[in-house]
């Protein structure tokens, strides 16, 4: 029997889903222009770093904390995490990019599902109390659909791996088959990252590799670009 609940959430993992992820490299393009990333092996090394740093200590841990807040109807906790996700994202392009993607995802989720939490989140943005973040929206959608937090995080990490790989295929460039081999190679690391997220303390929230942030900042000054961030 098909699990429609999981398929509904997995729809948001489609690299063609119109959240704008295809327009953002989150610093990857800077590494490519500096020739630090130039083939599948160097991209995999960067993708592992991105997965184990930004997606672990920022997005992933935020999702775990937000899910607990949803279970306890703690609206102030959700707003607090939303604020931290925005202000700790120091590079302007990635900060604005995450806000744009979060706004698109929230609006699309509202078009597709009648989720009280997502409707509330959107209203908080209109009241200038929230910025909207894709990781938080994805968590709210999964919670609304009755999906467990472990699966929600797995799907979100997969969505990021898939979309960043497709962007690398265009930018390095790589072949489509090479891109699919990379995604297959990364699946075990997704599970390991999720397990690490559940071992973290809340005090670990926001730890990010300085080199990643510096290259995200440097992207503002690249002369030729195909990505917004």
From Swiss-Prot:
Domain of life: Bacteria
Main location: cytoplasm
Keyword Ubl conjugation: no
Claim: Nucleotidyltransferase is one of the keywords in the record: no
Localization annotation: Cytoplasm
HAMAP family referenced in this protein's UniProt entry, alphabetically: UreF
Protein's job: Required for maturation of urease via the functional incorporation of the urease nickel metallocenter.
Family: Belongs to the UreF family.
Name listed for the protein in its UniProt record: Urease accessory protein UreF
Gene name per UniProt: ureF
